[in-house]
Amino acid sequence: MLYPKRTKFRKYQKGRCKGCKADGTQLCFGKYGIKSCEAGRISYQAIEAARRAISRKFRRNSKIWVRVFADIPITSKPAEVRMGKGKGNTKGWIARVLKGQILFEMDCVSLSNAQQAATLAAHKLGLSIKFFKWS
């Protein structure tokens, strides 16, 4: 599971995901990539599920780079608890994703395999994504 060992604060405000990503929109490591087409939040479970789906498709002799990291804690209060009495406990971790941000990079695989893996990962992520290759 991908989440930080320690953070500056235990709990964060919700914040908003809006705008486009200025940097982190070009491929740095692999030949193929998965880019987000909209801004949103991705949980660490979704990132891990997408990574597993991609690696399961490729088997061996392939390289995958995860370019997002879930570093923001999400809190929630237990069921049937009255309002007030402070902010809830940490429930999980999310990554804020902006439009145009690269989520995954792949290398040492064929184009058709990479496209199929991107489709599998898209079902896990919950955001609209775009597959593209290095040019």
UniProtKB/Swiss-Prot annotation:
Top-rank taxon: Eukaryota
Keyword Glycosyltransferase: no
Keyword Mitochondrion applies: yes
Family as reported in the entry's similarity comment: Belongs to the universal ribosomal protein uL16 family.
GO biological process per UniProt: translation
GO MF assignments: rRNA binding; structural constituent of ribosome
Species of the source: Marchantia polymorpha
Record gene name: RPL16
Record's GO cellular component terms: mitochondrion; ribonucleoprotein complex; ribosome
Protein name: Large ribosomal subunit protein uL16m
Keywords: Mitochondrion, Ribonucleoprotein, Ribosomal protein
Pfam families per record: Ribosomal_L16
